[in-house]
């Protein structure tokens, strides 16, 4: 009998990617987040598609169209809350996925890592333009503050900001184009995710030990399909618990008020997943400096492969690097907390110290720890 799975061109690609794929036998639950991100993306595209059928991207009706979805559309409240909280789950998985990559040295697959950083930027752009669409107070003022940062770019800045706005301020033209961007970007993200997977399958997966796993590999199906299925169920359970019991806990109360350009909210802040970058932006008392620090806080991921000094790939057997990694994690949580606080003491100084420590850890301390651990591995030590 002909095995179509191995002969038909399209099925052959799927077979080599998800069924007969040779996978290291020792990869842990930290390797589940790639598939969980794929599931999050599918959930976001499906719920977003149904929301787009009822949403209107006009300043006069955007807010009421979202209210209409929640009140009058069959299960509209569920679609909207799944979409909003699905974004939070997406970023939670994204941060854990990146953290895993840093801890286990997966960034040494440079092509996969660089595509991943581009993916992160694309997902962040998607989430930002999406947050503007309900046209609540925080949507409007968040869009105003963040797009205004473009005007800090020397010479072309003010023109660039007006070009993005489609006028002299955030208005109808901005909302319409942001809806268009929010519709197209997830499909670009999907294409990038396929390229990400393509580059990963050129080298094969990394594993917790960081050593070459070619001597001990097992087929992806059934071992890791069942493991991924468990991850799917756990993530869906958390998402549904959040959506059904506490759907607004991660949102901002100001977004329940329609956008009003004449009334500025007391504390303008983005969604929780951007707060760490927002804290770094605010910690520098200069507009252009803040924008550069904001960009650097994300783009620093691109140079992490160049800063790898250790002889071992993974941090599994490197206690000093492990300690610094968890300090970095705590530092990012601190930055997230600071980003949600008002601009006053002691939050200003804490934010500035945490921002300095963030760059110091990645650029100086972690590479030095790698060199020290190399020295400690020598027999004379």
Swiss-Prot record:
The lineage of its organism: Eukaryota, Metazoa, Chordata, Craniata, Vertebrata. Binds 2 heme b groups non-covalently. The chain crosses the membrane at residues 33-53, 77-98, 113-133, 178-198, 226-246, 288-308, 320-340, 347-367. Its cofactor is heme b. Heme b b562 binds at residues 83, 182. It is a multi-pass membrane protein. Pfam families: Cytochrom_B_C (PF00032), Cytochrome_B (PF00033). It comes from Phascolosorex dorsalis. It is found in: Mitochondrion inner membrane. Component of the ubiquinol-cytochrome c reductase complex (complex III or cytochrome b-c1 complex) that is part of the mitochondrial respiratory chain. The b-c1 complex mediates electron transfer from ubiquinol to cytochrome c. Contributes to the generation of a proton gradient across the mitochondrial membrane that is then used for ATP synthesis. CDD domains: cytochrome_b_C, Cytochrome_b_N. The keyword Electron transport applies. A ubiquinone binds at residue 201. Keywords: Electron transport, Heme, Iron, Membrane, Metal-binding, Mitochondrion, Mitochondrion inner membrane, Respiratory chain, Transmembrane, Transmembrane helix, Transport, Ubiquinone. Gene3D superfamilies: Cytochrome Bc1 Complex, Chain C. The cytochrome bc1 complex contains 11 subunits: 3 respiratory subunits (MT-CYB, CYC1 and UQCRFS1), 2 core proteins (UQCRC1 and UQCRC2) and 6 low-molecular weight proteins (UQCRH/QCR6, UQCRB/QCR7, UQCRQ/QCR8, UQCR10/QCR9, UQCR11/QCR10 and a cleavage product of UQCRFS1). This cytochrome bc1 complex then forms a dimer. It comes from the Eukaryota. InterPro entries: Cyt_b/b6_C, Cyt_b/b6_C_sf, Cyt_b/b6_N, Cytb/b6-like_sf, Cytochrome_b, Cytochrome_b_C_euk/bac, Cytochrome_b_N_euk/bac, Di-haem_cyt_TM. Belongs to the cytochrome b family. One of its GO terms (cellular component) is respiratory chain complex III. Heme b b566 binds at residues 97, 196. Heme 1 (or BL or b562) is low-potential and absorbs at about 562 nm, and heme 2 (or BH or b566) is high-potential and absorbs at about 566 nm. GO terms for molecular function: metal ion binding; ubiquinol-cytochrome-c reductase activity. This is Cytochrome b. One of its GO terms (biological process) is mitochondrial electron transport, ubiquinol to cytochrome c.
